[in-house]
Design a protein with these regions (language model features):
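N-terminal "arm"/small-domain region of PLP-dependent enzymes with the aminotransferase-like
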Residues: 1-56
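Hydrophobic "anchor" residues on beta-strands that sit immediately upstream
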Residues: 29, 150, 181-182
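Glycine/Thr-rich phosphate-binding loops of Rossmann-like dinucleotide-binding domains
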Residues: 38-40, 90-91, 114-115, 160-161, ...
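Active-site pre-lysine segment of PLP-dependent enzymes
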Residues: 135-146, 159-182, 186-206
Length: 206
């Protein structure tokens, strides 16, 4: 019997942060973007409703969910993609936009899944140096080549906690070639109260 060989991706595995620390019982972990409050009691009540028929496959297009999201954020539902967490959306972006030998720029310290999914499709990951643990617009622009297809960044950034201002983010978009996709990960936007900050959603949804 011939056993098929696995394809050797030669990529690093995702390494999650610590969830437990010795001698500490009550820990609020922010790095995984998990709710420290747990599930909403209202959500629990709705899920327990037998009329929902959760044993059936859901709508693959998530039309109802996208419609409700579009109402809340005042944007076109046709511009909304739903996924099983940001991981799946990042994976879809890489599969749709990247070919082998294309280049993807990511900050020096950033969410590992950007580089993992880019590597899986055969793209080259290029790291832009951070200055004092802050994403640098000039360093990203300096790394751009004719092969650059995507720039991934989280704003505010995980794990550094620093951020690009509204002015810096708009400057980056302006300086990038129009053919380069700028992916702004807003996972931690709700923590930002600084007046000079604007989420990618607020800046680019239209």
């Amino acid at each position: 019997m011939t056993i098929p060989k696995f394809k050797n991706f030669n990529i690093e595995a995702y390494k999650p942060g610590k969830s437990k620390i010795k001698k500490l019982k009550k820990i609020i972990k922010l790095s995984a973007n998990e709710s420290a409050l747990g599930m909403s009691p209202r959500a629990k009540k709705i899920i327990s409703d037998k009329k929902l028929k959760l044993e059936r496959y859901p709508d693959g297009k998530s039309e109802l969910l996208r419609r409700e999201i579009s109402k809340k954020y005042k944007c076109n539902s046709n511009k909304i993609i739903c996924g099983a967490g940001s991981d799946e959306v990042i994976q879809m972006i890489c599969q749709l936009y990247l070919n082998p030998k294309d280049e993807v720029i990511v900050p020096q310290y950033s969410f590992l899944m950007y580089r993992i999914y880019a590597n899986i499709v055969g793209a080259k990951v290029v790291f832009a140096k951070e200055l004092k643990f802050k994403i640098s617009v000039s360093e990203i622009i300096n790394k751009v080549t004719k092969k650059t297809k995507i720039v991934f960044l989280a704003n505010p950034n995980n794990p550094t906690g620093t951020y690009l201002t509204k002015k810096e983010l708009l400057e980056l978009r302006k300086k990038l070639n129009k053919n380069i996709l700028l992916v702004v990960d807003d996972a931690y936007a709700e923590y930002m109260k600084n007046k000079d900050y604007k989420s990618g959603l607020d800046l680019f949804k239209n």
